[in-house]
């Protein structure tokens, strides 16, 4: 009987949860859910100088916002340092590791010699079989793995296939530094083993680490977990992903108005495919996810495709869900628009009423919020340049003549205001647009908006007429 699937996401808290890390977390989450297993979260905080609480908070918040829940408590690698030291000492006792007293100067000379000879720098094993009694006085040694020197180290990778390294090219790596702190290589192996990880899914920049870590597993007599090294994400131009391409923190995507479900859907298709299907519900992703369907070449990040997919998710979302999502981005996007960081009951009600018209064109929540400007714009409305153009010439007099017809309406709705404006345009012998366009500009301050009669209905009689009177008095 096979053991239950356990995956892990193990970010270093030296910065935000970037988009590549988010995809790695998603793939681990999907694989665990696909097989009814568990995904664990480990914070690799052994770099004490660069690890920050703010970065830890950003990672956890980003995971929660994306809807990627983890099983059990968060595991902090630094807190397990004593266990890592214990394992290093056990390797020493079994003869699978040894004390190395090479000085910093000696190591630097090894690197320099290797460069001069045109080969990769590697430790030359000078303390591998040397008698410890020859140790120089007052020098604290490191502990190195006694790695195999002949044959090959092989990793059967679910994405990369069979990958081999000649053992002569892999030197005796450091397990424990001279100050007693464990190295990343040792800590990862011990933590993955103790956590019961059965499947490692991570970026292919860790592929060489897989060889090193496999050697540690075998020296300890532990089972090596299955491996899957996924290709990195590049920009649309094929270059290494940078901020201009979209190498941003997950919180930046949130604040730019992307829906978590849309971002999940976009990320799952970066490197993984399932036929020609582009749009996946979470349930469909889980049911279909397969490591063998991940390609080996770098995926390309395309903002245009992400925006298009996000727009689709916006159009298909319930109005109340979108209003809640707007409230999430208000702390970041509200103040610059003169909005509070949370919705007032009145504005929430107006947004709900306006949402059917607002969401048809928006590709992001920020666009949606900007389209809703007319709902929260202070009076008298400031006009953009195109709106000013629409209100030039005969437009003000037409609106002045229209005003009594609107004031006389017994019932105020999209249908009744449309009938009144159409009737007025016919009586004046002009096209509907010659009245509706200036009316839109007067009511919203913009040349584009949701359908103008929907705007009038959402604003209500008093607000709509007051804005029209403001413009006529200007």
UniProtKB/Swiss-Prot annotation:
InterPro entries: aa-tRNA-synth_I_cd-bd, aa-tRNA-synth_I_codon-bd_sub2, aa-tRNA-synth_I_CS, aa_tRNA-synth_I_cd-bd_sf, Glu-tRNA-ligase_bac/mito, Glu/Gln-tRNA-synth, Glu/Gln-tRNA-synth_Ib_cat-dom, GluQ/Sye. SUPFAM superfamilies: An anticodon-binding domain of class I aminoacyl-tRNA synthetases, Nucleotidylyl transferase. It is found in: Cytoplasm. It comes from the Bacteria. Residues 113-133 have a biased composition (Basic and acidic residues). Gene3D superfamilies: 1.10.10.350, HUPs (3.40.50.620). ATP binds at residue 243. The keyword Lipid metabolism does not apply. GO terms for biological process: glutamyl-tRNA aminoacylation. Keywords: Aminoacyl-tRNA synthetase, ATP-binding, Cytoplasm, Ligase, Nucleotide-binding, Protein biosynthesis. A motif ('HIGH' region) lies at residues 11-21. Catalyzes the attachment of glutamate to tRNA(Glu) in a two-step reaction: glutamate is first activated by ATP to form Glu-AMP and then transferred to the acceptor end of tRNA(Glu). This is Glutamate--tRNA ligase 1.
């Amino acid at each position: 009987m096979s053991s239950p699937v356990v995956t892990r996401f193990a970010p270093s808290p030296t910065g935000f949860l970037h988009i590549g890390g988010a995809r790695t977390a998603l793939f681990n989450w999907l694989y665990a859910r696909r097989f009814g297993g568990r995904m664990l979260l480990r914070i690799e905080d052994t770099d004490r100088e660069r690890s920050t609480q703010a970065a830890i908070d950003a990672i956890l918040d980003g995971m929660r916002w994306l809807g990627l829940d983890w099983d059990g408590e968060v595991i902090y690698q630094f807190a397990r340092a004593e266990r890592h030291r214990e394992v290093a000492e056990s390797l020493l006792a079994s003869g699978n590791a040894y004390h190395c007293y090479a000085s910093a100067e000696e190591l630097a000379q090894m690197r320099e010699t290797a460069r001069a000879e045109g080969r990769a720098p590697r430790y030359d094993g000078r303390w591998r079989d040397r008698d410890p009694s020859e140790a120089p006085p007052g020098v604290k040694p490191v502990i190195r793995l006694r790695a195999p020197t002949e044959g090959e180290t092989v990793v059967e990778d679910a994405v990369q296939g069979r990958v081999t390294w000649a053992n002569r090219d892999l030197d005796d790596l450091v397990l424990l530094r001279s100050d007693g702190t464990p190295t990343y290589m040792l800590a990862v192996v011990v933590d993955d083993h103790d956590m019961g990880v059965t499947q490692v899914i991570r970026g292919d920049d860790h592929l060489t680490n897989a060889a090193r870590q496999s050697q540690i597993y075998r020296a300890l007599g532990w089972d090596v977990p299955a491996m899957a090294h996924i290709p990195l994400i590049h920009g649309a131009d094929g270059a290494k992903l940078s901020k201009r391409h979209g190498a941003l923190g997950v919180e930046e995507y949130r604040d730019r108005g992307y829906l978590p479900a849309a971002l999940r859907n976009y990320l799952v298709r970066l490197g993984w495919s399932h036929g020609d299907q582009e749009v996946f519900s979470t349930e469909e992703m889980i049911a279909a996810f397969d490591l063998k369907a991940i390609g080996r070449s770098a995926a390309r990040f395309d903002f245009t495709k992400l925006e298009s997919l996000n727009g689709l998710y916006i159009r298909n979302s319930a109005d109340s869900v979108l209003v809640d999502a707007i409230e999430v981005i208000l702390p970041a996007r509200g103040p610059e628009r003169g909005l509070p960081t949370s919705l007032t009951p009145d504005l929430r009600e107006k947004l709900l009423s306006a949402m059917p018209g607002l969401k048809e064109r928006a590709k992001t929540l920020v666009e949606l919020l900007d389209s809703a400007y007319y709902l929260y714009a202070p009076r008298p409305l400031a006009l953009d340049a195109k709106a000013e153009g629409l209100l030039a010439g005969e437009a003000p007099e037409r609106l002045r003549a229209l005003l009594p017809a609107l004031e006389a309406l017994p019932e105020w709705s999209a249908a009744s205001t449309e009938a009144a404006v159409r009737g007025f345009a016919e009586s004046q012998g002009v096209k509907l647009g010659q009245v509706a366009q200036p009316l839109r500009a007067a009511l919203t301050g913009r040349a584009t908006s949701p359908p103008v009669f929907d705007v009038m209905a959402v604003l209500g009689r008093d607000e709509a007429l007051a804005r029209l009177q403001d413009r006529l008095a200007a």
